């Protein structure tokens, strides 16, 4: 996975769900400050023994394009540790205003997280997502329904496909 995100080489993940759809030349672009008119959000697949995976996405509505602008992939994180890392990354995102001035993000970001992170652990402790929300790391549960995983995988394949302009709708910046 690291080779995929760092170098854009998803061929290293043999048999991966999106390996056939991934093309480094088409899907990787240089990083850039995000226009402050774009929406930035994050998505998390929470884990402890298995890694937590957080992706920051910038949405360019004018061109109907999504940019994955940052990623965190780490196991063994307690809720407060994950919240601290996520909030630090939120603030490190570079944004630009309409006048070309670049600064660090000051907008409070929100995201979706696997609804299991809101489940009662049976230990008397609050659910992991609730612990993070309490620390200012805002999460809403990702809605699940029968077939939702397959549906979302299909949507990602559509975003990775080239559009009318010859470019995919999902890129890694």
Annotated model-derived regions:
Residues 35-38, 48-51, 104-107, 166:
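Short, well-ordered loop/turn elements at secondary-structure boundaries
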Residues 7-11, 48, 59-62, 161:
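Hydrophobic/aromatic-lined pockets within catalytic cores
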């Amino acid at each position: 996975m690291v080779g995929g995100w760092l170098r854009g080489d998803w061929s290293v993940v043999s048999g991966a769900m999106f390996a056939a759809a991934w093309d480094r030349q088409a899907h990787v672009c240089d990083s850039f400050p995000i226009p402050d008119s774009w929406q930035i959000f994050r998505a998390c697949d929470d884990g402890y023994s298995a890694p937590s995976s957080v992706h920051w996405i910038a949405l360019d509505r004018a061109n109907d394009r999504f940019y994955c602008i940052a990623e965190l992939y780490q196991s063994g994180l307690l809720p407060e540790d994950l919240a601290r890392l996520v909030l630090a990354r939120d603030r490190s995102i570079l944004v630009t205003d309409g006048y070309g001035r670049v600064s660090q993000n000051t907008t409070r970001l929100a995201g979706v997280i696997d609804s299991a992170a809101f489940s009662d652990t049976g230990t008397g402790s609050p659910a992991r997502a609730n612990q993070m929300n309490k620390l200012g790391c805002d999460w809403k549960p990702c809605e699940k329904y029968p077939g939702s995983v397959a549906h979302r995988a299909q949507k990602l394949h559509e975003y990775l496909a080239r559009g009318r302009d010859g470019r995919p709708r999902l890129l890694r910046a």
